[in-house]
Amino acid sequence: MRLVIEESKEILTTHAGLYAVGELLRKTKLRSRLNAIRLAGRPEPEISHGDVAVSYIGLLCQGKNDFDHIEAHREDDFFRRAMGVRVVPSSPTLRQQLDEAAGQAGWEAILREESAHLLARKARPTAVTVGGRDLVPLDIDVSPWDNSGTKKEGVSRTYHGYDGYAPIFAFLGVEGFVVHSELRPGKDHSQKGTTKFLRESIIYARSVTGRLLLLRLDAGFDSRDNILICRDARVEFIIKRNLRGESESVWLEWAKRHGSMREPRPGKRVWRGALVCDVEGKPVRMIVEAVERTTRANGQVLLLPEVEVQAWWTSLPDDPDTVIRLYQEHGTMEQFHSEIKTDLDLERLPSGKLATNNLVLQFALLAYNILRLMGQAMFGDPTVPLRKARQRRRIRTVIKDLIYLAARLVVHARQVRLRYGQGNRWGPPLRRICEALA
């Protein structure tokens, strides 16, 4: 049977979930704050800063970052209504206004602040229970992004061995809400500029939750400055030590004398212990783990024992096993990095300018948190087709199942209705999510 393909006069959309995105953005002051800013080269813009910003967030929530993708929505009546914009900008207008605002107009701080305010109203980051206390994890780390083969400003050799950027992120809670981000040249060391970033991250995190924070950092952030910042801010911390060439055999002997031993398998013994060291005249607890292997997991006997030593600074009074377990959970943030890079398709940033790409990253921070809120709103909803219990829904799942939902926009009798197809099992969850987040 041959089908006749033709254009309909009905208003149909493949991205009905953007209505929920628009509803959440209407809970913020993003539009009014951006519209109050006067750019030097555009004091009276034809398309308001708020419309430009909200339109771009609508793109990012579909997993698109290239400015040219906005052209598909310029005559999209549903996109305009859902996002609450008067005019959808063209691709050149979007690019030019972001270039003009980047790094000098304060847009970056506004995006971070409005994102934090939205999380404070709509999110409750999950804590971890440690010694009878609830601590909200604050995980900070760098995630190299591959931009090989480009001549973008700031692209340089990363520690992963390719050319790209080295953005740093601060994730809050078990769910991984982003409270701070910053785009950095690929060659920059993890610690460069981190003291300022760390202070700001703690401020943003505390604007979201009033509970105690547990900061977790890897060995690239082993610095006395970071420890002092945590102590001054009264934040609990676990920071992996960079042993910097210290003798592993010496630490192994110390662990054998002062630590407790367990043998997880024949040929592998693990010692764990704790000691107190002096840092800038103040005592700081250190956890040490030493591993000695005489055989491999497959049973192969080693000619000489293999020794592996790891250590962590911590403010927690708990036993070494608890501290190490909490630090190992820090690795979950690699999943959050992956979602930003792949699910939001952000690794290859759209501009050739470092400042503009950093502004794009702040837009992505807000878009990511909106999608995360939508994913968290699925829990406890009996109409959601997914039944497997999880702590969070992957961003890709939210985009695929909720954002890309087909529907029909009906304007009749002074009412505007969004109708999804009969039998579409994701329609009721979207309706409930909009009601829950309203």
List each language-model region with its residue ranges:
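Dynamic "connector" segments at or just before major functional cores
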Residues: 1-163, 167-189, 194-208, 400, ...
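An anionic, glycine-rich sequence signature occurring as long contiguous blocks
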Residues: 1-4, 236-342, 429-438
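Conserved nucleotidyltransferase catalytic core and NTase-mimicking acidic/glycine-rich helix/loop elements
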Residues: 4, 370-401
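Structural motif
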Residues: 12, 42-51, 302, 351-361
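Short amphipathic alpha-helical "interface-anchor" segments enriched in bulky aromatics
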Residues: 70, 320-363, 367-376
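Acidic/histidine-rich, metal-coordinating catalytic segments
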Residues: 141, 212-222
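Short, surface-exposed connector motifs at secondary-structure boundaries
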Residues: 206-213, 232-233
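Short, surface-exposed basic-aromatic patches at helix termini and helix-loop junctions that form
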Residues: 227-236
